Every structure is written in structure tokens, then in C-alpha cells.
Swiss-Prot record:
SUPFAM superfamilies: Nucleotidylyl transferase (SSF52374). It catalyses: nicotinate beta-D-ribonucleotide + ATP + H(+) = deamido-NAD(+) + diphosphate. PANTHER family: NICOTINATE-NUCLEOTIDE ADENYLYLTRANSFERASE-RELATED (PTHR39321), PHOSPHOPANTETHEINE ADENYLYLTRANSFERASE (PTHR39321:SF3). It comes from the Bacteria. InterPro entries: Cyt_trans-like, NadD/NMNAT, Rossmann-like_a/b/a_fold. GO terms for biological process: NAD biosynthetic process. Its EC number is 2.7.7.18. Catalyzes the reversible adenylation of nicotinate mononucleotide (NaMN) to nicotinic acid adenine dinucleotide (NaAD). Pathway: Cofactor biosynthesis; NAD(+) biosynthesis; deamido-NAD(+) from nicotinate D-ribonucleotide: step 1/1. This is Probable nicotinate-nucleotide adenylyltransferase. NCBIfam families: nicotinate (nicotinamide) nucleotide adenylyltransferase, PRK00071.2-2.
Length: 195
């Protein structure tokens, strides 16, 4: 493990919340706290991506997004990192595989909103992600039906588990939890010029 990389010990469970965080906002904080409480995680790492292959416009500079995320998310069990840039990975499947190599003995859980589950089947090697690590899905009101009808949810319907044991589950495994609404999005914040 390199200097400056987040710490995690053998046997610990780390939730991975990836995104551009352009900008990070209270909705990210909210789902992070929910994930810590509901999925049996020791840590959550915000993986601030160098770029998002599914978005047409480049994000703000990585260092700025990481600094602003750290200023917003102050929790003793949360780490903000730009580790994907150091790993040289572009896609989530590569990032997860790289983290598993760099942190043997650490269990990882991929975290996502239900809006991402609804289009997860469009991600590069999404089925490899499901095969490598459990996936924790957090749904705001109104997102449940579309997400549960999504191709990924249908294909892995038999791998759905209860939320509390997700951190100890063998992949493929996923859990779906409803969370109270915090109506914020990075796109809307950028459009208003608040970023």
C-alpha cells in the first residue's frame, strides 16, 4: 500500500462510493451515513474519479473536487480519495479488481444509488463487478420500481440479501434499502452555478 492511500485492516469491510463528486453534496453525505448504518461497514471510501466515461463533459480538477469533498464529509469512518487516478483505472470493474489486489484481506462492498442500478447493465463489465464484490443499493422514494425491474436486478435476483449481512456476504450478493429523500444532485448544483 502506498503512502497517502486510505487505511483498512485485514478483515475489515469497506464500502466504495464512486463518482465524480462534481460537486459533492449533502445527498452523498446522507447515503454514506445510511450505508455505514445499514450494510455492516467499517469504512466508506469516496472514490473521486478522474473522469466519468458515461458523462460528456469533463469534471472540475480532481484535487479541487477531493478538497471540497473532504470539507463537506467529516466523519471518522469516511475517507475521501483520488486513488483511481493513481491506480490508472478508467472503469469500475478495473478499480475494484485493483483495490482487491492492493488490499488483500479487506472486504469491499460497491455502493450505488438505485438510479445507477437502473442503468448498471450499461456499465463496462458490470457483471464482473457483481462477481467480485457485494453491491449495496440505496433508493430514494420513487426509484424503487425502475431499479428492481432493471436487467442487473433481474439477472441477479437470486443473489439479493438482507442489508445487515451484506458486508460479510460472498459475491455475487446485493442488498436494496430505501432511504429518506434528500433531493440534491450534482447536475442541478452545477446548473445553478453554485459550484
Amino acid at each position: 500500500m502506498r503512502s497517502g492511500w486510505p487505511m483498512a485492516g485485514t478483515g475489515q469491510t469497506v464500502g466504495l462510493l464512486g463518482g465524480s463528486f462534481d460537486p459533492a453534496h449533502g445527498g452523498h453525505v446522507h447515503i454514506t451515513r445510511q450505508a455505514l448504518a445499514r450494510f455492516g461497514l467499517d469504512w466508506v471510501w469516496w472514490l473521486v474519479s478522474p473522469g466519468n466515461p458515461l458523462k460528456p463533459n469533463p469534471p472540475a480538477p480532481l484535487a479541487l473536487r477531493c478538497a471540497r469533498a473532504r470539507a463537506l464529509m467529516r466523519h471518522p469512518r469516511v475517507r475521501i480519495t483520488g486513488i483511481e487516478a493513481e491506480l490508472g483505472t478508467r472503469y469500475t470493474a478495473e478499480t475494484v479488481a485493483g483495490l482487491r489486489r492492493c488490499y488483500p484481506g479487506v472486504r469491499f462492498v460497491w455502493l450505488m444509488g438505485a438510479d445507477n442500478l437502473a442503468q448498471f447493465h450499461r456499465w463496462d463489465r458490470w457483471d464482473e463487478i457483481m462477481a467480485q464484490v457485494p453491491v449495496g443499493v440505496l433508493a430514494r422514494p420513487g426509484q424503487r420500481l425502475a431499479a428492481l425491474r432493471a436487467p442487473a436486478a433481474q439477472r441477479f435476483a437470486g443473489a439479493r440479501r438482507g442489508a445487515a449481512g451484506l458486508g460479510r456476504a460472498q459475491a455475487p450478493a446485493w442488498a436494496f434499502v430505501n432511504v429518506p429523500l434528500v433531493d440534491l444532485s450534482s447536475s442541478e448544483i452545477r446548473a445553478r452555478g453554485d459550484w
